[in-house]
Amino acid sequence: MKIAITGHKRGIGNEFAKQLSDRGHHIVGISRSDGENIRRVAHTASLIEPCDLFINNAISMYAQTELLFEVWHRWQPYKDVHHIWNISTKVCEWDKDAQIPGLTMRESMEYRNQKMSLELAHFQLEAQASNTKMMLIRPGQVKTWKHSDENATPVDRYVSEVLSQQELV
């Protein structure tokens, strides 16, 4: 299977790329460190369009949501089944005034609002008849380069658990 992953160089995106590659899947990695920018929505969507699965992981303002719409609409004419996994956050379940550890209140609200935008778009598209199958993934505290809380789930274990629940060809 050909799989596009935004933000594949660090954190959860990197772990998805590693584990899926180890399972024999071809990874199309899209990352700022490779000179890509998901804010260039049409260009990024053109890299994703030939793939079977899009793991929509990277966040850059509201580009993650814009990219979801763009890819979903590009895949509509196809009869083949495609998949989009949107990586959101459990923070969307929190009280709107909750502060994320390590972020200011303003940064916490911006992050939550961007992910809520993604979730609303996800539910809107998921409700429509389509050959594009959607999955929303809401990680809680996952131990990555950015989050090192001792109570957090190790990123390799978290991704392994997500993948064990999926049927990938």
Question: Which ranges hold each PLM region?
Answer:
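Conserved hydrophobic beta-strands of the Rossmann-like cofactor-binding core
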Residues: K2-I5, F54-I55, I84
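Local beta-strand N-terminus motif with an aromatic residue
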Residues: P50-C51, V81
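Well-ordered, non-membrane alpha-helical segments in soluble/globular domains
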Residues: V41-A42, L53, Y62-H73, N113-L120, ...
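Adenosine-cofactor binding site in Rossmann-like domains, unifying the SAM/SAH pocket
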Residues: I27-S46, I59-E66
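Short, hydrophobic beta-strand segments that form beta-sheet elements in well-ordered domains
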Residues: I3-I5, R23-R32, I137-R138
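N-terminal Rossmann NAD(P)H-binding glycine-rich loop of SDR-like oxidoreductase domains
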Residues: A4-R23
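Catalytic loop of short-chain dehydrogenase/reductase
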Residues: I59, A63, H73-Q128, G140-W145
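C-terminal helical subdomain
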Residues: S130-I137, V142-V169
